């Protein structure tokens, strides 16, 4: 990477199911585009790939497999997009991502009772985000929505376990806790304030789990 090339920023949204990640990530992408920032919006799992289609059937409870197998598939789904993400960032394009490796650890360790260190190992070496916005809502926040429960992890007791596991990342300096029980506009405004603090300057990549 040349010194005069500004690397794009990598922003991740994390949180429980139905915490507002899709809404807030879309709003941020719109904001960046309106401010002449070239940006790519990604989602994990990406259900369009071969691996992603298997994951999608699992989440919809249309197939079953061992806990270890599904965890490794989630990780593989992230790895198959690493070249794309790296290429975008090197071109100066920002990447906004709905879920990332932190979901893998929180869900597999919290919901499936897999060892936390074991869960982290497959994602070691993935590109580290510049900032993670954790949309913090209570585990029972979305239980009254009409479509709640359609996917395998959408149970309040399961969400409670995942919620506790997410706390392992709260000490990271790039992890920003956002109260997501408020109005959509207020949440978005807080996120924009944090994004404007991100320095855009030449730098090398950092990787998980450094």
Swiss-Prot record:
Residues at which ATP binds: 18-23, 182
Biotechnology: Phosphorylates AZT monophosphate (AZT-MP) more efficiently than human DTYMK/TMPK. The conversion of AZT MP into AZT diphosphate (AZT-DP) by the human enzyme is a crucial step in the production of the active anti-HIV drug AZT triphosphate (AZT-TP).
Mutagenesis or variant effect for residue 108 to A: No defect in thymidylate kinase activity. 1.3-fold reduction in affinity for dGMP
Gene Ontology CC: cytoplasm; mitochondrion; nucleus
Highest taxon, organism lineage: Eukaryota
Residues that, per the record, bind dGMP: 17, 74, 78, 99, 107-108, 153
HAMAP family reported in the protein's UniProt record: Thymidylate_kinase
The protein, known as: Thymidylate kinase
Organism of provenance: Plasmodium falciparum (isolate 3D7)
Gene: TMK
């Amino acid at each position: 990477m040349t010194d005069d090339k500004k690397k794009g920023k990598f922003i991740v949204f994390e949180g429980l199911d139905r915490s507002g990640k899709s809404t807030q990530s879309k709003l941020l992408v719109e904001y960046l585009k309106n401010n002449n920032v070239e940006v790519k919006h990604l989602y994990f799992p990406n259900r369009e790939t071969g691996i992603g289609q298997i994951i999608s059937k699992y989440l919809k409870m249309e197939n079953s497999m061992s806990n270890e197998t599904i965890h490794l598939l989630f990780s593989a789904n992230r790895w198959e997009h690493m070249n794309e993400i790296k290429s975008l960032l090197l071109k100066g394009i920002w990447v906004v991502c709905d879920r990332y490796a932190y979901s893998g650890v929180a869900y597999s360790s919290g919901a499936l009772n897999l060892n936390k260190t074991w869960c982290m190992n497959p994602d070691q070496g993935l590109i580290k985000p510049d900032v993670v916005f954790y949309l913090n809502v209570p585990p029972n926040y979305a239980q009254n929505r009409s479509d709640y429960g359609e996917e395998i992890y959408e149970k309040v007791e399961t969400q409670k376990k995942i919620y506790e596991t997410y706390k392992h990342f709260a000490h990271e300096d790039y992890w920003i806790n956002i109260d997501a029980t408020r109005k959509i506009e207020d949440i978005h405004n807080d996120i924009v304030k944090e994004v404007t603090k991100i320095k855009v300057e030449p730098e090398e990549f950092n990787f998980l789990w450094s």
